[in-house]
């Protein structure tokens, strides 16, 4: 626990005894505690334990330890803090803790809202379930409160992903075994067939109710006609009966519909979740060759967009399934109404069908291409923002923005084609009902010379039924096409080869091992017999021609490689004919060799990651702990990273912290080991990340430890501590495989494996037997031989440990942790409250062009008006015949339309009817009817084209704004925002804007304008209906208002719960080798399931709210229909027959249109949540200063560094820097000058400020005060690109990007091929490139993840050589290379940059002792800055102390290198 205030007499902390982890103790650092007046806080100390192998003494149980005037106190949490007493404490209040992940995790805190309760739906009775009454109190709660995730009830047991997976996996495994072409959906139907069937039954009953409605509409119209003809022959109450039957029928239909919707949504979400889970599990098992075919971005796309396609399909699957039956039944009933003219409708649909099918097939083709380009875009985004710091340091923003825009441009090109085909299909199907109406009624009139009202309006009702499936058919077919492509991609991924690492239960890795070998090799150990392992990579397409002159083309040289995945996988690096056997406890196998020899590959071969190429065998028996060269860190607390799912054991935990030298680090953290490390360990230095990874391995208490160059990321002193206290200490009884460049530890090995360039084993023997013949391992290199012999003699020196553990890399943590007083680095994801703001709608409207949107909106209004006017004209036409045939004497009072709106009738036409009842000007009437229909179709075409153009512009502009906003964000933004959260904007949110938002907006505008038109028609036809409709409309408003306040909150939470799924997935992909080595795949699958369940409970709650709303709106719509029928029955003697049919037909469709309009509004709001999230980033993310300031650009040749004006080239003047405003300074008034050509070495104690100095120079962090001057220019006054492009850095953690070797060396295409080859020769990668090139790829060799860290650092050096900078920064540039390569790099830097200013930060003092001056930093200030010879002679110098700490012989060697 953390106790921030120990000075309060009344402090009282209650602990939960049920917390399993609270059984241990908490280690708290008490510094300078004020004891005055605090007699109750007295802590007794006892049981001191000293560890001779380490300078860090700690006390067990209630003990204490002094170090640097700090006291470490162990508290037993079962005792109250007030019962402790502090002895000899100093006056300081900072503290740190370890041992308790969450002190209040298991406390029975009261749950707010419905949190922790069983699902309300699961507990609902039959009536409540059918009518969604159970959701009423939840809607009311959301209306009054701001909803939080923990206030939503628990997910129902039958919706939990683990339960669903168990059901599905049986059928999927059978499908894989028994089918040549496994069908995921077939397995899904077997698993959830009853749910599909139940949904179809409910929807089918709803469809039946839809067809019953027009039947009773016809009966009501007939009732009025018969009553008018002969009142005595008809029961006057018959109209009320029909009205009641119509109401009950509509109510039952609504109940069935919304039950069907909920079942379908639940089933679709289940399958979507299963796809996400299957993709996640599969990504944990892919072989290297399979993995090389799929980038992280492509796999993320499967989880986000492809899984979503299935969910979208299920939202309209019932409409799609019943579309054809509904059309067929409608045609039969239509034939019953109008006779053979109904075949005109069939003919029109038959003609349009081939066109629709053709468009559908084109949609499928373009969707497949579009998905491929989407994968490429996401791949670039993922890679960019994972390496954003490198991109900023190299000033590569423009290059990567062009690369990104190129990918997005290709995606938009196919998106445009896709949307064009989709909208052309929409135009056809939306126009078909109008075209059918024109032709059918025209033919009917020409044949029968009349239009009977009862038949015509029944026909109109059936056409309205047809209109719904026809309207949704293009959307549904479009989604089906996308789904078909997506499910094909998912199945292809699930069918990829899986790695076979042996028996998880028995902790074995078996590769090509026979039963006899298993019987012989039963002891814990490593048994490798004549194996040749290889990596597999994707070959490149035909390489471009070589460059003889620098290219002006700044686009990505690897931009046109979208077809690469179709190529066969070819072998790159291989580890040849390797044999070894390690089975004795306490064995230490050391693997050494030059850069690129295969040390890391050997480690991964032992893990079963490489592919066996011959008949050899590998068997690893026992549990394995693995530490990679680049430490993999989880986004969790430091403690969670160490425990890694194992039970907390206080004694071992303390021992691990001690031997991994982590105790001093905990002193820097406000929350000790509870500190949140951050994504990719961003909150820790390289050395700290490595030590946390080592601590994780040590705590696991495994049988075999595979350690890949773990000492490179720490300084020599900490390296010694780790070697003697971990490898030769706590792990002395374990089998350890250590790949290393630290040759001074070779004498301690029991076996040594020497690899040479190309992956061949040079020697495998004891170190003593090897030392005499070592020269041959490196081509008889006398330099390497001398170094190895020197290290062998120095090894004895290393036994001595000092009283201090000083990790130079620890600085970063202290600097970063000024940012972390609460121990939290990752920010909480932003979330707006209330309904979607109007400004977000305007954001979307203006993005596509406000004028275009207004034209489209006007098109919807006019289109709906003309469509409605067509039916009104039809009703007016039929009324002339009906009125003539019934009672000409009542004509003056029978037409309510004329009486209520005579100005409309008078202005439209003046119809003369002859004695036979024929319309004299029928030709004019027919001509107007056709003209209106044609105008309606033309308007549909025009507004669709305009809307299409608008949507493409909008999505293009929004993505551009998002990309540039994040690219220009300061570095702290990426340190505090998880990558998964950023990726979510570029995947799911962008996909919604690209594909779904325009659909929702289109349909909302369509249905809402329909509702307005219907209300206008009803008010004209039956104006007395407006009075009872008013309270219904008011009630309608409040219901939808309550709903929207609920739905938008749930949608926002759903979006937020989606981000951790992506973050966890990205984290898993980066650490999959570590997870497999520790056999932690199962635990991470459980975590994935938990994250899915959180997201699913939000989604299903949202869907339940949708059905709640829909049913209640249906009730209101059905009430309007009931009232309309009642009023018609009451006014049966005077109402116009045309008004009867028009009013009822439109009230019937009003229910559907109101529901659809409100649902689409809700859907639009949920989709607009993506606009909210994107606009938040585009409008609220802080931006870096301008890349270029035209008014203050540096002169050509800047910086010249010629000293022409007699001023130092680099001047720091009173530099003060904080990571953010309001945080403590990490650089405190630093001032110094650097002369032209000077070589400056920078070192210092923990938290000294070295990294901060570097960040200030590159303006990664802006200064709080002071200034930095380079060659006479204040760098804060010039653009970032102008500054950073003139500096060069060789980073500690080098990055190679997807693409070619050429693009990685010369991203800006500024150099010729010959220059690039020359650099490769200088950094000694020329032969390696020639060897691994396929088909003479050369510089166009495609790079992959199999390049070693050392090789990547050499590429970083190559970039600097090509750039020829005036100022070079080396940030531990030789950390991951062997001694020979270290010497090579140092020699190249000395020779090639002899005139440049060089700033070198290093753990290894040998890399800086030959500098002109040494700068020693401490606590953000310069404490020493002088020549190394002067500092080394000063006994009180910190630099002199650091030299002495390397050991007697090594310190003598270092002093011999110092210039005098």
UniProtKB/Swiss-Prot annotation:
Residues in ABC transporter domain copies: 560-783, 1210-1444
Protein residues bound to ATP: 593-600, 1244-1251
GO biological process per UniProt: sorocarp development; transmembrane transport
GO molecular function: ABC-type transporter activity; ATP binding; ATP hydrolysis activity; ATPase-coupled transmembrane transporter activity
Region feature (Disordered): 1-23, 37-68, 537-567
Record membrane topology: Multi-pass membrane protein
Residue ranges crossing the lipid bilayer per the database entry: 196-216, 238-258, 320-340, 425-445, 456-476, 842-862, 922-942, 1014-1034, 1108-1128
Polar residues: compositionally biased ranges: 551-563
Regions of compositional bias (Low complexity) in chain numbering: 37-55
Domain of life: Eukaryota
Segment forming the signal sequence: none
Cited InterPro entries: AAA+_ATPase, ABC1_TM_dom, ABC1_TM_sf, ABC_transporter-like_ATP-bd, ABC_transporter-like_CS, ABC_transporter_C-like, ABCC_6TM_D1, P-loop_NTPase
UniProt keyword list: ATP-binding, Membrane, Nucleotide-binding, Repeat, Transmembrane, Transmembrane helix, Transport
A GO CC term assigned to this protein in UniProt: membrane
Positions of the ABC transmembrane type-1 domain: 196-482, 853-1166
Localization annotation: Membrane
Family: Belongs to the ABC transporter superfamily. ABCC family. Conjugate transporter (TC 3.A.1.208) subfamily.
PANTHER family attached to this UniProt entry: ATP-BINDING CASSETTE SUB-FAMILY C (PTHR24223), MULTIDRUG RESISTANCE-ASSOCIATED PROTEIN LETHAL(2)03659 (PTHR24223:SF456)
Protein name per the record: ABC transporter C family member 5
Gene from which this protein is expressed: abcC5
């Amino acid at each position: 626990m953390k106790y921030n205030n120990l000075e309060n007499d009344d402090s009282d902390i209650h602990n939960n005894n049920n917390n399993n982890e609270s059984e241990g103790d908490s280690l708290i650092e008490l510094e300078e505690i004020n004891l005055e007046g605090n007699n109750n806080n007295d802590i007794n100390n006892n049981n001191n334990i000293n560890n001779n192998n380490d300078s860090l003494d700690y006390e067990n149980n209630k003990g204490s330890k002094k170090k640097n005037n700090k006291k470490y106190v162990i508290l037993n949490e079962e005792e109250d803090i007030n019962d402790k007493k502090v002895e000899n404490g100093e006056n300081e209040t900072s503290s740190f803790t370890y041992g308790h992940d969450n002190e209040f995790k298991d406390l029975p805190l009261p749950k707010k809202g419905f949190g922790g309760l069983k699902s309300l739906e699961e507990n609902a009775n039959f009536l409540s379930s059918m009518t969604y009454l159970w959701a009423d109190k939840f809607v009311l709660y959301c209306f009054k409160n701001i909803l939080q995730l923990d206030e939503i009830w628990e997910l129902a047991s039958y919706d939990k992903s683990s339960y669903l997976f168990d059901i599905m996996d049986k059928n999927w495994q059978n499908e894989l075994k028994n089918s040549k072409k496994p069908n995921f959906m077939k397995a899904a139907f077997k698993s959830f067939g009853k749910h599909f069937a139940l949904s179809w039954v409910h929807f089918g009953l709803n469809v039946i109710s839809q067809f019953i409605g027009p039947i009773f509409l016809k009966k009501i119209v007939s009732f009025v006609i018969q009553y008018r003809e002969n009142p005595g022959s008809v029961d006057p109450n018959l109209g009320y009966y029909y009205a009641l039957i119509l109401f009950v029928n509509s109510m039952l239909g609504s109940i069935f519909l919304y039950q069907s919707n909920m079942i379908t949504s639940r089933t679709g979400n289940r399958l979507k979740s299963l796809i996400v889970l299957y993709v996640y599990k599969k990504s944990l098992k892919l072989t290297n060759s399979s993995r090389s075919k799929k980038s992280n971005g492509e796999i993320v796309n499967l989880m986000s967009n492809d899984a979503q396609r299935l969910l979208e399909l299920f939202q309209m699957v019932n409409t799609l399934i019943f579309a054809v039956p509904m059309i067929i039944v409608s045609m039969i009933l239509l034939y019953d109404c109008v006779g053979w003219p109904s075949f005109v409708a069939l003919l029109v649909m038959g003609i349009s069908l081939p066109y629709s099918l053709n468009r559908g097939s084109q949609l499928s083709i373009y969707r497949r291409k579009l998905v491929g380009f989407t994968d490429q875009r996401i791949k670039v985004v993922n890679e960019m923002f994972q390496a954003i710091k490198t991109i900023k340091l190299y000033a590569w923003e423009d290059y990567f923005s062009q690369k990104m825009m190129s990918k997005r441009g290709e995606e938009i090109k196919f998106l445009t084609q896709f949307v064009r085909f989709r909208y052309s299909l929409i135009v056809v199907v939306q126009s078909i009902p109008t075209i059918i109406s024109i032709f059918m009624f025209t033919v009917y009139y020409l044949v029968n010379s009349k239009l009977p009202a009862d038949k015509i309006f029944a026909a109109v009702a059936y056409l309205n039924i047809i209109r719904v499936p026809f309207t949704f058919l293009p959307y549904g077919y479009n989604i089906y096409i996308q789904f078909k492509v997506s499910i094909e991609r998912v199945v292809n991924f699930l069918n990829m080869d899986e790695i076979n690492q042996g028996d998880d239960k028995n902790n074995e890795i078996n590769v090509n091992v026979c039963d006899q070998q298993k019987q012989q090799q039963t002891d814990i150990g490593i048994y490798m017999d004549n194996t040749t392992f290889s990596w597999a990579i994707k070959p490149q397409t035909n390489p471009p021609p070589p460059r003889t002159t620098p290219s002006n083309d700044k686009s990505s040289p690897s931009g046109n490689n979208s077809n690469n995945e179709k190529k066969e996988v070819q072998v790159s690096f291989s580890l040849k004919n390797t044999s070894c056997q390690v089975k004795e406890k306490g064995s230490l196998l050391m693997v050494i060799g030059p850069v690129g020899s295969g040390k890391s590959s050997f480690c991964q071969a032992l893990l079963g990651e490489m592919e066996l190429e011959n008949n050899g065998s590998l068997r690893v028996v026992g549990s394995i702990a693995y530490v990679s060269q680049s430490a993999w860190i989880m986004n969790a607390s430091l403690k969670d990273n160490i425990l890694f799912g194992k039970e907390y054991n206080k004694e071992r935990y303390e021992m691990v912290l001690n031997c991994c030298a982590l105790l001093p680090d905990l002193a820097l953290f406000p929350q000790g080991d509870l500190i949140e490390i951050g994504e990719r360990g961003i909150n820790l230095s390289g050395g700290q990340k490595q030590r946390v990874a080592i601590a994780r391995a040590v705590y696991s208490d495994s049988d075999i430890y595979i350690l890949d160059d773990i000492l490179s990321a720490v300084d020599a002193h900490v390296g010694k501590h780790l070697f003697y206290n971990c490898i030769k200490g706590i792990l002395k009884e374990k089998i350890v495989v250590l790949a290393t460049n630290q040759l001074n530890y070779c004498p301690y090995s029991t076996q040594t494996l020497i690899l040479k360039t190309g992956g061949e084993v040079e020697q495998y023997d004891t170190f003593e037997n090897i030392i005499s013949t070592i020269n041959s391992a490196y081509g008889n290199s006398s330099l390497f031989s001398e170094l190895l012999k020197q290290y062998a003699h120095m090894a004895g020196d290393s036994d001595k440990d000092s009283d201090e553990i000083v990790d130079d890399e620890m600085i970063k943590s202290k600097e970063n942790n000024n940012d972390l007083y609460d121990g939290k680095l990752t920010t909480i994801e932003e979330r707006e409250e209330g309904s979607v703001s109007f400004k977000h709608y305007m954001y979307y409207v203006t993005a596509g062009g406000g004028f275009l949107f207004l034209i489209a909106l006007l098109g919807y209004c006019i289109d709906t008006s003309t469509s409605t006017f067509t039916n009104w004209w039809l009703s007016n036409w039929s009324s002339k015949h009906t009125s003539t045939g019934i009672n000409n004497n009542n004509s003056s009072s029978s037409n309510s339309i004329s009486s209520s709106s005579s100005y409309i009738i008078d202005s439209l036409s003046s119809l003369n009817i002859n004695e036979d009842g024929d319309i004299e000007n029928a030709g004019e009437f027919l001509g107007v009817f056709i003209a209106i229909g044609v105008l309606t179709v033309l308007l549909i075409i025009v507004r669709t084209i305009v809307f299409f153009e608008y949507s493409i512009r909008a999505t293009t502009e929004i993505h551009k704004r998002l990309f540039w906003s994040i690219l220009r964000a300061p570095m702290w933004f990426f340190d505090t925002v998880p990558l998964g959260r950023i990726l979510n904007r570029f995947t799911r949110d962008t996909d919604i804007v690209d594909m779904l938002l325009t659909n929702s907006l289109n349909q909302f505008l369509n249905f809402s304008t329909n509702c307005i038109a219907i209300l206008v028609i009803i008010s004209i036809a039956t104006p007395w209906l407006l009075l009872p409709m008013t309270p219904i409309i008011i009630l309608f408003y409040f219901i939808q208002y309550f709903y929207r306040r609920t739905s938008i909150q749930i949608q926002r939470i759903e979006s937020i719960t989606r981000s951790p799924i992506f973050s966890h997935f990205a984290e898993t992909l980066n650490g999959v080798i570590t997870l497999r080595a520790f056999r932690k795949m199962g635990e991470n699958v459980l975590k994935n399931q938990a994250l899915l369940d959180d997201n699913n409970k939000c989604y299903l709650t949202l869907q339940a709210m949708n059905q709640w709303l829909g049913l209640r709106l249906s009730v209101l719509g059905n009430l309007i229909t009931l009232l309309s029928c009642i009023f018609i029955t009451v006014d049966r003697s005077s109402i116009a027959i045309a008004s009867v049919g028009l009013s009822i037909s439109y009230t019937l469709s009003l229910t559907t249109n109101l529901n659809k309009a409100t649902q689409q509004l809700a859907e639009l709001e949920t989709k607009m949540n993506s606009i909210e999230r994107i606009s938040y980033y585009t409008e609220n993310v802080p931006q870096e200063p301008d890349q270029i300031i035209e008014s203050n650009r540096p002169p050509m040749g800047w910086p010249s560094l010629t000293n022409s004006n007699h001023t130092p080239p680099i001047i720091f003047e009173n530099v003060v820097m904080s990571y953010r405003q309001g945080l403590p300074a990490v650089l405190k008034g630093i001032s110094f000058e650097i002369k032209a050509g000077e070589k400056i070495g920078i070192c210092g104690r923990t938290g000294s400020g070295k990294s901060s100095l570097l960040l200030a120079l590159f303006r990664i962090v802006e200064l709080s005060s002071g200034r930095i001057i380079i060659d006479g220019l204040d760098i804060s006054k010039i653009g970032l690109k102008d500054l950073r492009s003139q500096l060069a850095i060789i980073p500690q953690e080098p990055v190679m990007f997807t693409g070619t070797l050429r693009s990685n060396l010369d991203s800006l295409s500024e150099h010729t091929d010959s220059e690039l080859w020359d650099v490769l020769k200088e950094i000694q990668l020329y032969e390696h490139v020639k060897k691994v090139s396929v088909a003479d790829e050369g510089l166009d060799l495609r790079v992959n993840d199999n390049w070693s860290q050392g090789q990547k650092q050499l590429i970083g050096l190559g970039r600097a050589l090509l750039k020829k900078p005036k100022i070079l920064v080396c940030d531990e540039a030789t950390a991951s290379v062997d001694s020979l390569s270290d010497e090579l790099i140092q020699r190249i830097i000395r020779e090639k940059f002899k005139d440049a200013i060089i700033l070198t930060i290093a753990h290894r003092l040998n890399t800086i002792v030959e500098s002109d001056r040494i700068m020693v930093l401490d606590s953000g200030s310069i404490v020493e800055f002088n020549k190394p010879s002067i500092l080394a002679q000063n006994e009180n110098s910190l630099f002199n102390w650091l030299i002495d700490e390397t050991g007697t012989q090594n310190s003598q060697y270092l002093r011999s290198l110092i210039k005098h």
